[in-house]
Amino acid sequence: LTVKQPKNVAKETKTYYRRLGWSATRYGFLTNLAMFLVGGKLKVKGNLTGRYADALAWMYLAISALRRFEAEGRKAEDLPLLQYSCEYALAKSQEAFVGIYQNFGGPVGAVLRTLGLITLSINPLGRMPTDKMSAASAQTIQKFDDQFRRVTQGQFIPEDQSFGLGRLLKAFDLTTQAAPVKAKITAAQKKRNLP
């Protein structure tokens, strides 16, 4: 399991490819270690197996986000979504590795709990997205525009706009259309032209 950085990737994504490479290397080492030390009993240790599955799933989601960003032409408006997705996935992957280290038994487990956790704290895979990053990614999908349609492409959008999700999306569209008027009113209030 390795993550190679493709040639000519966007400079904003290089660090994510590098961190995913570290993550994949760590995952490969820990899987081999588990197969060697735990062997057939790995199935019995369901929680440990679940942590391995969590780490792999979060790495897969991060690489999928990177691949989609590249495939769709590196659109600048998608960058906040990509950064949020990768930071979140890498933080969750790190959380899974911490769980693996803490629950590995025997003398090897003791080494992993000390050196492994120290290594993860010195050279973390990721931290949860900052509030600024969360706000930027949320802002990108708060308009019912082409980007929203592209990001949600392939998802079920009901035709009937009278109830449920269809009604909610209609309200979302109307709110987006009313945004310029709201901005004018807010500007007039700031200039004290309106109460």
Q: Where are the regions a protein language model picked out?
A:
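Flavin-dependent oxidoreductase catalytic core characteristic
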Residues: 1-195
